[in-house]
From Swiss-Prot:
pH note: Optimum pH is 7.5 for AHBA synthase activity. Retains its activity over a broad range of pH. Over 84% of the maximum activity of AHBA synthase is maintained over a pH range from 7.0 to 9.0.
Name of the protein in its database record: 3-amino-5-hydroxybenzoate synthase
Keywords assigned: Antibiotic biosynthesis, Lyase, Pyridoxal phosphate, Transferase
Modified residues (N6-(pyridoxal phosphate)lysine): 188
Origin superkingdom: Bacteria
Any single GO BP term: polysaccharide biosynthetic process
Description of the deletion phenotype: Inactivation of the gene encoding AHBA synthase results in loss of rifamycin formation; production of the antibiotic is restored when the mutant is supplemented with AHBA. Cells lacking this gene do not accumulate aminoDHS, aminoDHQ, or their spontaneous aromatization product, protocatechuate.
Self-association state and partner proteins as the record states: Homodimer. Can interact with RifL.
A GO MF term: transaminase activity
E.C. number: 4.2.1.144, 2.6.1.-
Swiss-Prot/TrEMBL cofactor(s): pyridoxal 5'-phosphate
């Protein structure tokens, strides 16, 4: 039994009268779907502006956002999509469900983001998209990846599910000349329980218009006679969710500023614990939105890491084991897996294998707490690591 107990952390999701008033506003407008109301339209305009994008399209969840973006980028049977081997499974399954082959590549041992050299080595004539995931809100090396994209002609699709409000060398996600997707699932940095968005930079208006049709059963905005222009599905976000997301967006920047300040302290405290290595940074990623507080205990086996997480949870911390390497999940091999064995992929993804075994993360609400709570958090982690 761990002698120390965690302090109270701020609740998540957070809400106040802004969400309440938004829900009433959506209710009273009398139209609760996007084709009849204005909450989704307003949220899309506000979210696009906040991220420097030309357009935003709100959808049902982050996985659908990825599927939709990949589809309008031409991903399908006979194509390949490069993804990080260390990521949530949706990054790979979104491509696999479209009939493509997902090619996992290794990540950097310090930042947990795509290794550009590994990406360059994985590009083939079949590669249709390169998908960087901005892990825990730390943006991937967009300079190196943009150069690979320019040299090969393979476009980037940013999986920004963790990176609401993040920046790379002063540029927002929508200003980096590539399509990006976001998630608004319950634990994310802004949430309506579920939801997602695809943002399109200048020059991608045609893909945006196609995506709108695809996400609405092929129907144009003004269709009243069931003229389905192209094949599609129903991925439309509802008006209630959009009203909540508008309120969530309004407080995003303030929360990011708090998390950033708190991470500076917590990472220093974690780094002082023998055997603990906090997630590294990149000075070019000059605004990290801090979706997770991640750290490694290099050399720890997966079994011992899992026991460590159990002790942290028992003490009251919102702690989690890191993502499993996607090639070590059964789901990865069901559809669109490369013609390689698990061991073959693991040999070229040593960092992923290590991180997925020895990494722990804390939910971002920890970073909304005060300094005393962070000191207490570090003490609990130090005690648990000493017994790991």
């Amino acid at each position: 039994m761990n002698a120390r107990k965690a302090p109270e952390f701020p609740a998540w999701p957070q809400y106040d009268d802004a969400e309440r008033n938004g829900l009433v506003r959506a209710l009273e407008q009398g139209q609760w779907w996007r084709m009849g109301g204005d909450e989704v339209n307003s949220f899309e305009r506000e979210f696009a502006a906040h991220h420097g994008a030309a357009h935003a399209l709100a959808v049902t969840n982050g996985t659908h956002a990825l599927e939709l973006a990949l589809q309008v980028m031409g991903v399908g049977p006979g194509t390949e999509v490069i993804v990080p081997a260390f990521t949530f499974i949706s990054s790979s399954q979104a491509a696999q469900r479209l009939g493509a082959v997902t090619v996992p590549v290794d990540v950097d041992a310090a930042t947990y983001n795509l290794d550009p050299e590994a990406v360059a080595a994985a590009v083939t004539p079949r590669t249709k998209v390169i998908m960087p995931v901005h892990m825990a809100g730390l943006m991937a090396d967009m300079d190196a990846l943009a150069k690979i994209s320019a040299d090969t002609g393979v476009p980037l699709l940013q999986d920004a599910a963790h990176a609401h409000g993040a920046r790379w060398q002063g540029k927002r996600v929508g200003e980096l000349d590539s399509i990006a997707t976001f998630s608004f699932q319950n634990g994310k940095l802004m949430t309506a329980g579920e939801g997602g968005a695809v943002v399109f930079p200048d020059g991608e208006t045609e893909k945006y218009e196609t995506a709108f049709l695809r996400h609405s059963c092929g129907r144009p905005r003004d269709d009243r006679r069931y003229f389905h222009k192209i094949a599609g599905s129903n991925m439309r976000l509802n008006e209630f969710s959009a009203s909540v997301l508008r309120a969530q967006l309004a407080r995003l920047d303030e929360q990011i500023a708090v998390r950033d300040e708190r991470w500076t302290l917590l990472s220093r405290l974690l780094g002082a614990i023998d055997g603990v290595v906090p997630q590294g940074g990149d000075v070019r990623a000059d605004r990290n939105s801090h979706y997770m507080a991640m750290f490694r205990i290099p050399g720890l086996t997966e079994e011992r890491r899992n026991a460590l997480v159990d002790r942290l949870v028992e003490a009251g911390l919102p702690a989690f084991a890191a993502f499993r390497a996607i090639y070590r999940t059964d789901a990865f091999w069901e559809l669109g897996a490369p013609d390689e064995s698990v061991d073959a992929i693991a040999r070229r993804c040593p960092n992923t294998d290590a991180i997925s075994s020895d990494c722990v993360w804390l939910h971002h609400r920890v970073l909304l707490a005060g300094e005393p709570e962070l000191h207490a958090t570090a003490e609990i982690i130090a005690d648990a690591v000493a017994r790991a």
